[in-house]
């Protein structure tokens, strides 16, 4: 469970706590009778997949244990960040910091945030387009139309169609009635 980012390492105390937690978990026996997470709920979630026809009796128990271990590990890493900030309450920022600093939790990062960060960085440092002398574009580029595989095969843009009734006009009488009933007048 080493952090490969290098810039924000956990304190040695935290690494020791995590190591002792994982060594105890690896040595411990799987208790088939006591569960912290509801097994029937896990079975329901597993059955949402249309490809699942039968579930072995051990599968929900193992998945429950894996989820418990995942939650405990993330909580411990978040708790270490809360202690670094001299707080005794976990906050979302602690969980975010634990996720950001741990490579194995990269799947929890929000792709939309990453895309926004990339677009902001691109806008801050625009790359100039090289001048085109002959009026020709580089291979694979056609203005306004995507090109498939740089072969010059143009893909038509899908046409947007409005749903019937999606854009309805309001008659003058209805507008007046809305105004008399206390409408917001577009504010």
Curated annotation (Swiss-Prot):
Residues 177-187 have a biased composition (Basic and acidic residues). GO terms for molecular function: DNA binding; DNA-binding transcription factor activity; protein heterodimerization activity. It is found in: Nucleus. GO terms for cellular component: nucleus. InterPro entries: CBFA_NFYB_domain, Histone-fold, Transcr_DNA_Rep_Reg. It comes from the Eukaryota. Residues 163-187 are annotated as: Disordered. Expressed in flowers and siliques. Keywords: Activator, DNA-binding, Nucleus, Transcription, Transcription regulation. Its main location: nucleus. Coiled coil: none annotated. Belongs to the NFYC/HAP5 subunit family. Stimulates the transcription of various genes by recognizing and binding to a CCAAT motif in promoters. Heterotrimeric transcription factor composed of three components, NF-YA, NF-YB and NF-YC. NF-YB and NF-YC must interact and dimerize for NF-YA association and DNA binding. This is Nuclear transcription factor Y subunit C-8. It comes from Arabidopsis thaliana (Mouse-ear cress).
